[in-house]
Amino acid sequence: TVKTKDRSLSAQYEHTIVVTDNGCEILTLRKDDTIPAIISHNE
């Protein structure tokens, strides 16, 4: 956790993502995440 210029608290997190020919897969989703684990490319 860090403080911003205006002294607000801020946090960062990252995901591990596998990029494939067909799209990508997020490997580090939590149970409460609302984004899809697999994102496909539309061709």
Swiss-Prot record:
Keywords: Aminopeptidase, Hydrolase, Metal-binding, Protease. One of its GO terms (biological process) is proteolysis. Its EC number is 3.4.11.18. It catalyses: Release of N-terminal amino acids, preferentially methionine, from peptides and arylamides. InterPro entries: Creatinase/aminopeptidase-like (IPR036005). GO terms for molecular function: initiator methionyl aminopeptidase activity; metal ion binding. Its cofactor is Co(2+); Zn(2+); Mn(2+); Fe(2+). Binds 2 divalent metal cations per subunit. Has a high-affinity and a low affinity metal-binding site. The true nature of the physiological cofactor is under debate. The enzyme is active with cobalt, zinc, manganese or divalent iron ions. Most likely, methionine aminopeptidases function as mononuclear Fe(2+)-metalloproteases under physiological conditions, and the catalytically relevant metal-binding site has been assigned to the histidine-containing high-affinity site. The keyword Hydrolase applies. Coiled coil: none annotated. Monomer. Removes the N-terminal methionine from nascent proteins. The N-terminal methionine is often cleaved when the second residue in the primary sequence is small and uncharged (Met-Ala-, Cys, Gly, Pro, Ser, Thr, or Val). Requires deformylation of the N(alpha)-formylated initiator methionine before it can be hydrolyzed. Belongs to the peptidase M24A family. Methionine aminopeptidase type 1 subfamily. This is Methionine aminopeptidase. The gene is map.
